[in-house]
Amino acid sequence: MRIAFVTQWFPPEPGTFVAAAIADGLAERGHEVHVLTGFPNYPTGRLQAGYPLRPYRREIRSDNVTVHRAPLFPSHNGSAIKRMANYLSFGVSASWIARTKMPIPDVWLTYSSPATAALPALTVPRRLRAPSYLLLQDLWPDSVTESGFVHGKLGRGIDAALHRFCDWTYRRSAGIGIISPSMADLLVERGVEPAKIHLLPNWVEDTHLSPYQAPTDALRRSLGLPEGRLFMYAGNIGELQGLEPLIEAFAKCPETSLVLVGEGIARASLQHLVTSRDILNVHFLPSQPIDRIGLFIAAADVQIVSLRDTRLLRATMPSKLQSCMAASRPVLASAAGDVADLITASESGIAVPPGDVPAAIDAIRRLRDTPTDTLLEMGRRARAHYELNFAPDVGVDRLESLLERATATRRNC
């Protein structure tokens, strides 16, 4: 198949390993993949060095993967107007690139967050049309309104417009892949046919990780990390992650250390909290390139996944959880819903209710006192669950089958 894969974010941006795994995994099966993406500016909102903004840029990633970059308004701050300008500018310019620079595909695959990434597949001229398959990472506009970016009269207007747009994209799509089970219920409530919905969890490559490697003080020293029982959060530091209660909990557990690796709009306020409270066991590090992040994950005893408690976030599965499990690390999850259910069912960590500081303190102390061998066994159970459900071969098999089914039907073209 010739696959047009639309994703606003793609390497070299940090945190784009899922999109990269999709493109590379399909290409390794012999499919011709054309990635339509933006110029790298995530998560800082500043263009990366070597990527000056221009009308179009073409790159060859591998024999079967061609990257087409569309210009956009670079921004990733707390301004709702600037953030929407970022999303819309990519959707519009990517639609132009799809019309003028890309070959006719057999199927469009859209990595949907933001929802505006669906524009190219659904607005191309008839001669370029092909079945469109949506891979939903989160549900819009719920994720926008719950993040607190929009409110008041403007927020209500944006919410209504995005609802209409998203419902239109769902109707026009040949199929919709969801990353967590509870997403299906929310989509059915929105009027999506259940037959269109397929559970398609994200998968992650593990070539940059070091599964089964026990953390050592020597490795921590080489990375500038604190010694002793070490907890780590590696990923986007945003409002939806709800990390403040965890920092409050670690402040009560000074014999442990928490390292937060990443960037995001909530980082500055969390750093201010740590500084103003003189919390000495919480540390911040910048985002790390993919060839180094595996070392940091391997250096920690426990990885952290954190999400605020909302109806939407109870129905999501952040891809960082798959990375933690692939690295065979036990997980402390401050999350509800599907994430908590997975941690409990796989016996790979401890889940506590989001925002519950006493429960988090208790979990931190339990993991602090857990023997290293027991933590490693929890990590092995995490790895086993990854290999069964989130390994690349498993994910590519599922996606390839669904895309072939969509191509065969030629629906909604």
Residue ranges and their predicted role:
Residues 51-57, 210-224:
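A short helix/loop element that forms part of the nucleotide-sugar donor recognition site in Leloir-type
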Residues 99, 116-119, 123-127, 156-178:
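Membrane-proximal helix-turn-helix segments that form the acceptor-binding/catalytic region
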Residues 182, 203:
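Carbohydrate-associated surface elements
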Residues 1-60, 248-251, 411-413:
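N-terminal subdomain of nucleotide-sugar transferases
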Residues 302-305, 323-334:
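Short hydrophobic beta-strand element within catalytic cores of glycosyltransferases
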Residues 256-262, 268-295:
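Nucleotide-activated donor-binding/catalytic signature segment of Leloir-type glycosyltransferases, i.e.
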Residues 228, 366, 373-389:
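A short, well-ordered alpha-helix in the C-terminal region of glycosyltransferases
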